[in-house]
């Protein structure tokens, strides 16, 4: 069996490592560097350049040089409109997905990622002297299902079987905790070029267990570069009355200067930015020359630093720990070299951050360790990761019913039994969701599939078992089975889309912000379900036994049913309105069942069943075991 290499496929830079003699080793590329820029360029001659050589020619070829492709991977075109504004190359729609227009053709984000992976694969093959076909690849902890699948696809394009996708902070913890004998509670604060993650873990004696994770897939070093770039454009416009925003070559030079200034300000109090011949007008060439102090830089980027603190708060809350209980805060990612970030982390957790690991290499090292575990070369190391967002399906009333909660250890498998919402319903539509909001429409749709051939039966009778199976890569498989007929259908959620920045925020952050609204909607949906079920049961009672009941009582019940139906037709009816209609109808239905009981005598059996039926939605929602609930499935023709 060949080596399983470890790759950190980063937004800005990537890195490859292997296990050698029981120890992880970062490999040096052809240029003699331990990291490779995640940049791919296409030349007029038809050549494809990858890494440092591609980055070097970006100023003269900005429209055909692709960087930060990781921000686009696994996402639909409609979701990346903000990102498009930040890059000099052209992003186009390709069906629902996005692609880059380069030299008259298109390249997908997966293809760009594959080009970087292929270069790192060759670095490993050159070092080992043998073919490499398997890898462990890391992704941001907050990558959703589609983005993970797209990353696996990039590996396949590069000729690599991705044996495992693991979260970047988890990989860093694996590298950090590999030799730790004493149990420690640690925070991995991972601030990379394009993404931010924070994970809280327990490490010790070969076990790395994730307690909680959170993050922002659109917060990274790129954002700091953009702040400096926009400041330079504004300053130049003030001095020269020339706007550089539409000059792609100038923008590329400004981007490189901004990145260089950011790096220099990590060790210096001030930096000089000097770009001769940045542009020209009728009076001749124009030069950009200015100075930027660390104090000014900190002031301009203060909001970005603060943005990273909110995921830290949420991860701590989810883990059940206090900041004082954390033993170490390990800094990962190149952006953690920024002094303002180090200070914010120290202030938040109340301790000096741990800088014992190389922030650019530790993730690849952890991936290599996991590769060694999978290959059997590394013993006594156990990795217990989690899924970052809750997973579930849409049920009656447009509610999301969660099957797998966020921060559940993976791999994980969970089944729940649902039923139909209409009589003789022949099929159900399984709507798979990811997110933290109560209502299905506020969460991310991962996919849909149909289970057909359900035998005719009254609503609530068919038993449909839905199973969610999330594998060790964090990729979801969903199946549905009709328990009576044995018919089943399953789906592997594929990379149909990713989440926009707004969607990711809504997934968890907005859940708190809209807590009251979500609560009202969920309560109204519950009351609607109860009333709808009681209407059904009352109509059935009148149909089956109406002849034995007083005409006046039946008339009153029918009027209450009509009133309830009218309220149900009002999609904006409040929970109180629905509850009031339920109580009025329930009182009348109780009278009917009492009359029926008197007429039939105190015989057990049917009378008890009628009484049960008359209890309506609340009774039926809670009877039959906790695993059986009515599901809102529509007939699919």
Swiss-Prot record:
Inducing factors: By stress conditions e.g. heat shock.
Pfam families named in the record: HSP70
UniProt entry keywords in alphabetical sequence: ATP-binding, Chaperone, Nucleotide-binding, Phosphoprotein, Stress response
Phosphoprotein listed as a keyword: yes
InterPro entries: ATPase_NBD (IPR043129), Chaperone_DnaK (IPR012725), Heat_shock_70_CS (IPR018181), HSP70_C_sf (IPR029048), HSP70_peptide-bd_sf (IPR029047), Hsp_70_fam (IPR013126)
Family of this protein: Belongs to the heat shock protein 70 family.
Protein name per the record: Chaperone protein DnaK
